[in-house]
A protein has these predicted regions:
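Short Lys/Arg-rich amphipathic alpha-helical segments
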Residues: 51, 55-57, 61, 82, ...
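Conserved acetyl-CoA-binding loop-helix of GNAT-fold acetyltransferases
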Residues: 100-114
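Conserved beta-hairpin
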Residues: 39-63, 70
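Short amphipathic alpha-helix that is part of the acyltransferase structural core
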Residues: 1-34, 38, 54
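Conserved active-site alpha-helix within GNAT-family acetyltransferase domains
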Residues: 116-117, 122-124, 130-150
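A short, internal acetyl-CoA/4′-phosphopantetheine-binding micro-motif in the GNAT/acyltransferase core
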Residues: 90-100
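Conserved acyl-donor/pantetheine-binding loop and adjacent beta-alpha core of acyl/acetyltransferases
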Residues: 58-91
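Short glycine/proline-centered loop/turn elements that form peptide/ligand docking sites
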Residues: 108, 133-136, 152-159
């Protein structure tokens, strides 16, 4: 059974994680625990309950804000003219040997579900992501994310409408 867990370096073997992108691998090993301790971001991993040490994928969440004029005309229409709060998924990675098997979809679903739960306590309009390239952008668009008007590789998903 796949489980989402908060990163715990005493349990999760970050050094063995390889998504094929050195900067995302290195972040998990070198910076993730530090960022969590400093309240810069929270890091969540996807594991198999039979082997919780093996990280199948991870994502980070932090607070963000966005100017409404950057949103699509449809979303912008009923919002205030000042910056609004959002969530930012700063990093998102799936183990290279599992890519294309639905792990990314599961992990993204976990992130959206978590945002919806947090949103019950702290208002936030959307989940923001920054795609590294057009292939990654297409992945997010498939799940309903919309590009910002002025930043085509930055996207958002309005949540909880």
């Amino acid at each position: 059974v796949l489980e989402e867990q908060r990163l715990d370096s005493r349990i999760h073997n970050c050094a063995e994680f390889d998504c094929g992108k050195p900067e995302l691998n290195n972040y998990l090993v070198r910076n993730a625990t530090q960022d969590r301790r400093r309240n810069i971001s929270q890091i969540y991993v996807l594991v198999d309950s039979d082997d919780p040490a093996t990280v199948l994928g991870y994502y980070t969440l932090s607070a963000a804000q966005v100017d409404c004029d950057q949103l699509s005309e449809h979303d912008n229409r009923h919002l205030p003219r000042y910056p609004i709060l959002c969530f930012r998924m700063g990093r998102f990675a799936v183990a290279q040997n599992l890519q294309g098997r639905g792990i990314g979809k599961t992990l993204l679903g976990c992130a959206v579900d978590r945002c919806l739960r947090i949103r019950q306590e702290v208002a936030a309009f959307a989940l923001i992501v920054d795609a590294k390239d057009t292939d990654v952008k297409s992945f997010y668009e498939y799940f309903g994310f919309v590009a910002f008007a002025d930043k085509p590789l930055s996207l958002y998903l309005a949540i909880g409408r």
